[in-house]
Every structure is written in structure tokens, then in C-alpha cells.
Amino acid sequence: MALLQISEPGLTAAPHQRRLAAGIDLGTTNSLVATVRSGKAQTLADEQLADEQLIAGEQLIAGEQLIAGQQLINEKQRDLLPSVVHYHPQGIDVGWKARNLAALDPVNTISSVKRMMGRSLADIVQRYPNLPYQFHASENGLPMIQTARGLVNPVQVSAEILKTLAQRAQAALAGELDGVVITVPAYFDDAQRQGTKDAARLAGLHVLRLLNEPTAAAIAYGLDSGQEGVIAVYDLGGGTFDISILRLSRGVFEVLATGGDSALGGDDFDHLLADWLREQAGVATRDDHGIQRQLLDTAIAAKIALSEAETAVVSVAGWQGEVTREQLESLIAPLVKRTLMACRRALKDAGVTADEILEVVMVGGSTRVPLVREQVGQFFGRTPLTSIDPDKVVAIGAAIQADILVGNKPDSDMLLLDVIPLSLGLETMGGLVEKVIPRNTTIPAARAQEFTTFKDGQSAMMIHVLQGERELVKDCRSLARFTLRGLPPLPAGGAHIRVTFQVDADGLLSVTAMEKSTGVEASIQVKPSYGLSDDEIANMIKDSMANAQSDITARKLAEQQVDAARVLESLQGALAEDAALLSEQESAAIAQAVALLQQQMQGSDPQAIEAATKALDAQTQDFAARRMDASIRRALAGHSVDEV
């Protein structure tokens, strides 16, 4: 069965006609494009790269000064496109040329733009205070960067990278692409995913699907091998870390749990080493972005060299010294430990132990660091898989998926099931959260629930969409609010509103509310301006477990208070219309029961509120029966038996 069994209009392949598709790994540090040729997925090299730039990687170290922070390229790096864009009055450079201009013109050279995708300007400034760019805020608070070619936003910068990769693929395939699969971190939120789609649209690409990076790696590894069981995908890239626990069974590929940290990656290794080099060299870099870039370039080159050698000689800003693998490992050890803590949480979420993991797939260039491989191997108790280049494995998996979705493999038996990381729900009366789609539900998914009005004659309803695991609104994350208007003025509980939550294959959420009798409808697509980090998601899950008992107690109390308020409001309306049906003694008894209920509602004992509500209900049963009789008499007045 092909993934989702959905064919895009106009993309059904004719017999013997192969459609051109590509998989794109849009990375924080480097990006790649891959395709399937002769049945094999392979990354595509930049054949236009100048031969004089191709020198052995070892020459990056050994004390040679890199002129203006120039990054020299070895043969193996032809496939990589640095995710760097340089804006200058004459045009735009992308990739290695832009990368080599970063030290000379840091203000106009934008790198690691993926970290800015879908985030507000305030969030970016808080998370990354040392960025050299001149930021401006758009009307909705999103970041704009001042460049020599005017203001640009992260979506436009990403579009330049995608455009360059698409041109490489089209040159290699000698034709226009029919569609692409683009990979994103598993914890990209709605805004970040939508931003990626918008960038692809700007680049003129048809997106077949966004695919989680760890999932793409598992396609490249696990499904090719035909194994069944539980595997872990450890993805440590330049800017993000993801851990995914996946189950492979009879062609079904299911994500059991995901975790990680959207603000942790190899870039952080580089910055730690650059800071250490700055201290050793005694260089002041606060106001010199060129020296900052040079330090970072030297740190990157040293890190690469230390994956093969025990020591590396470095030279920066007139200072020359030596850095050892042991020194690097002491700097990055706390960060590696953070990744293992995320692995532990993911295993717990998946309900499996490390012993049950069949294979560990390593993804991302940062997994070449010996300490990372050693620590991951010790944690899972097995040697990680590294046979596919960790820089290329995600792009290869995306290419395999693109080949299927474009229609070249209609008989594929691959089925992919991703999950949402946190429950989605609505606010109900009393500040309670009604979960509509629970956490770890496979996507795409759609769920609907019916809600009703609280007050008589209610003509509108506020829909408050929430994300989280807690029972009360104040403890969950607000995603969006919208209002459904035009409800028929019925008694409380008379209107029936069907609310549908729909999460598509890319993880984007749409919420629709419809009143069933009139068909009035309102909807919203949730695009938060910035998202949660993986640590914040993990903390939300942890808090829900730590506060489970108190949350249940608080929910019971709120539910009883809402029920009591509903009874009191209904009784108030009935007394306003038909108080004459009661004797003075009955009125006094009801008033006493009302006072008792109101008193109990101020307390914190849900059982006492429930008992007082039942007592008031019992006290008003005769009154309710008389009202019904009176209503029937009024309805029959003036009519004969035959008319009835």
C-alpha cells in the first residue's frame, strides 16, 4: 500500500513514464538534495563547484590561517550545500561562496536561518542574543533582516536555499521536478512547518509532503533492511536534536514517541569551542563580527579534525595553539548528557526499555564526534548504525519517500504513521480542558466532539484551542481563539455544536465549529507565531504526571461547580416565570437549599457540592412537575380534543 494511498491531481504516473522527484534535507548548517536513479537513492553533488576549491580536509588545520574565514572544501563535501545566504548589491549568493563571505560581511550573510523559522523577533533575540544581523519587526512581530538588498524574512532566505537545491536536481535529472519531499525536525510546530511550505512555494516547488527528519532516516535504514522491531533514531544535526522511537512491523512504520531539543546541535559544540579558543587567544570579539566568524570557522575545522585525530593545531587572529580531543569532550559532555536525558524520556513515553531497542540509527554530522557515538552506544547497549553517511541519510530517506508519493512506486507496501507530541483540546465551562486529540495519536488524524450552550438564548460561542496534558486551562498552552456566531436562541443545552480537529500529514492543525441545526460554521488554522522547545514539551509532560492527582481533584471540583451553576441558573429562570406555583413554605425550603448550595460552591469539597446539588434537585422536583402541567394546559387552551 502506498503512503496514505492519495494521488495528487495530475500526478498519476502513466505506464512507463517516470516522474522526477527529489528529497530535500533543509538543514540548519548544511542542506542536501537526493533522488532515486536506477532504483537507488543518492545525493546529488554540485558539479559546478570550482575544482581549485577542492582540497584535502586536513589542510583546514595544521596551523594554516584561513583567509577571511574561508571554508575550504574537500571532495566529499560536493554534496553539501551550506545553509548560508549572502546578500550584496549585485545579487544573492548561496552555499559555499556565501559561507566564505561570512567573516568579511557577517551582517549580510545569513546562516542557521532554520533556527529563526516560525519564531517571533522577541523569541529570536532572547534565544540568540549574539546574532550580528540588523533585525526589524514586521506588523505581526515576526523578524525581518536588513540586508544590502533590503529587508528579508526567514521564509525568503530559506526559499533561496531551496531554489539552489532544486536547480541542482533539475540539472542532474535534465528536467523539471514534479514534486519534492522536504524534511523538518520532528518538533517543528505549525508555524515552522507552514513557513517551510511557504518557502518551497516561493522557490516554485510542489511539496508532496513534509517529513520528519528521524522518520526519513529510518526509511533509509530500517525499511531497506526489512527488519521488524523497535528502533531508535538519534539525530544530532547542526541546530536541532531529535530522538524518535519507532516500531517496524509488517510494512507498517509507526512512531511510538519523539523527543529532543530544538535549540541544541553541533552549532552549540562549535560555539563552546570558539569561546574556549577566544579565551586561550585572549581576543576581544564583542564588537568584531569578523573575528567572531573566524573563531567559529577555526572551531568547526578543529572539531572535524578531532573526530579523526587526538590533537589539532589551530591558528586564529595571530595566535597559534593546540586543542586536544579530551579538551573538546570536556566542553561538550554536558550537551551530550542532555541528549541522553531526552532519550530516556522518549523510551519512557514509548513504553519500552533500552534493552528492547533493536537498532540505533545515527543521523546528522555531529554524530561523527567520537564522544557522541561512545555515549549513545553505552546508553543503548549496542553499537549504533553508521553505514550510511549521517549527513546524507535524511536526504536519502526523503528521496525514497518522494519517489513513492510522485507515483513511481505504486505497489510500495510502506506505511508511515507520525504522531503529535502534545494533546489538543478545547476550553469548557469552569476553565476545564476537554481533550479532543490525545497525545501520540498517529497523523493524519481527525476527531470531532459535540458541545452545547450554557445559557438560555446564547447566540455565540468562543472556541479556545489548547495544547497540553493538564486538566485546567491555566496549565495548558493557548493556541488560538475564534468565535462561532449566529447560534439559534435556544434554551441552555438546546444548540448542538460539532467541533472538528484535523491534523494533516505535515502536522498542521485546523479547527472547525458548526451548529448542526443551522449549519453556521467558523474555522481557523492554527499557526502560532513561535513554538515550544522540546525541553518545554518534556516539562509539560513531566508536570502533567507530577500533578496528576491534584489535577484530577481540581477537575472534579470545577465540574461540580459548573453543574451547580447550571442548576442555579435554570432554577432562577423557572422562578422568574412560575414562582406563583409554589407555596410560601415551598419557596422558603427551596431558598434554603439554594443558600446551602451557594455556600458549598465557595468551598473545595466536590462531594459536598454534589450532595447539595442533589438536595436542591430533590427539593424542586414537585415544582418542575407543576411547571410541566401548567405548560401543557397553556398549550392546549382553546383547542378541542379532535384538534390535538
Swiss-Prot record:
One of its GO terms (molecular function) is ATP hydrolysis activity. The keyword Lyase does not apply. It holds the Pfam family HSP70. It comes from the Bacteria. Keywords: ATP-binding, Chaperone, Nucleotide-binding. GO terms for biological process: iron-sulfur cluster assembly. Chaperone involved in the maturation of iron-sulfur cluster-containing proteins. Has a low intrinsic ATPase activity which is markedly stimulated by HscB. Involved in the maturation of IscU. NCBIfam families: HscA (TIGR01991), PRK05183.1 (NF003520). HAMAP family: HscA. Belongs to the heat shock protein 70 family. PANTHER family: HEAT SHOCK PROTEIN 70KDA (PTHR19375). This is Chaperone protein HscA. It comes from Yersinia pseudotuberculosis serotype I (strain IP32953).
